[in-house]
Amino acid sequence: FFFILLLITQDFLNNLKESEIRPKNIFDEFLRLAKLDTETYFANSNREKIMCPACGAVGKHSFQKDNFDYSECPKCRTLYVNPRPIMDSFTNYYTNSPSSKFWATTFYLETAEVRRKKIWQPKAQLINGIIDMQVIENFQIIDIGGGYGIFAEEMQKITDQDVIIIEPAPHLAEVCRNKGFKVIEKFLENVSIIDLSKKPKCFVSFELFEHLHSPEYFLVNLNSLMQPNDIFIFTTLSSTGLDIQVLWENSPSVSPPHHLNFFNPVSIKIILEKTGFECVEVTTPGKLDIDILENNKNDIKDQFWKIFLETSNEKCKQKWQSMISDTGWSSHIMIVCKKV
C-alpha cells in the first residue's frame, strides 16, 4: 500500500534534477572543502577496525577515497568506512570544520526554498499518508536532526499533531525555536525518556543514517525512547542503488568524512531486527539516479550505461528511473519500521 502513497508524490518529483537541489558550483565547493578537512581533522586520528555494521561479518576492502578506506560486506553488501576514525575526531570535525559550516550556512540557505518545494512538501505529504495508514491517533511527530525546521513547517501545514525537533546544533536549534517549535537541543543518544511525553510517537529522520558513527548504538537508543508500536520513518543511501553501483568510488555520494554507512534493502532489515524493530516497508523512491549518472558520465566505466546516456531521450530516461525506483534499485531508500 505504500506504493500508492509514492504515486501521490510522483508529480512533484518526476522532473526533479540534481542541479536544483545541489547546484554544481556550490556542491563542488563543499566537496573541495570536505577533502581538505579530511586531512586537517582525520590525518592523525586513531582508527578502529570494525565488522559489518549490519550483519557483523568481516568486510573486504574495496577502495580508498580521500584517505578513508571503505569495505564491502561479502554477505549483505553493506558498504562502510573501515577502519573508522574514533568518535572524538568526528565531533571535532562537525563542530569546527569549514566544510560543515559551509553546508549548514551557505549550501543549506542557498537551496532552502527549492528543497522546500521539491523535497519537503511532497515528503510531508508522504509521511502524513503513512501515519494515517498506521492509524496512529493523538500522536507526536519527532524530527531527529531537524536542521532549519523546514520539514516541520510543512508537516504543521497538513496535520494538527505536535511536531517536536531534536537538534543538537545550537544555532539551528535557535532557528527552530524562533519558528515556534519545541526543540530538544541534544544528540539523540543523549535524549532521555523524561524529555518526551507519553503520547504515541512517529520519529522521522532524513539523510542522517549514513552519517552515524555507530548506527546500532543510535537504533538501540532510539528504541529505548519508544513505546511498542511507535513508528520510525527514515531515509538514507543504498549501497546497491544504481548510481552508487555504477560510479562506486567515484560516486559523489561516497563522500568522506560525511557518509560512513551505505546499507541497502536487505541489510537495513538485518540491523533493524537485531535492535528491536519490525521492518514494515522498505522502498527506494529516489528520482535522481539517472541524472547523477548523466552529471558524472566521465567517471562511468560500464559500456552499457555510457551508450544509454549518450543515445536515450528524456522520456526514455524517465521510464528507466521509474523502473529503478519501483523495483528497489534506487540509491535513495526509505524505511518504515516500528518498535516490537
Residue spans for each PLM region:
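A short glycine-rich, Lys/Arg-flanked "PGG" loop and its adjoining helix->strand segment in the class I
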Residues: 216-231
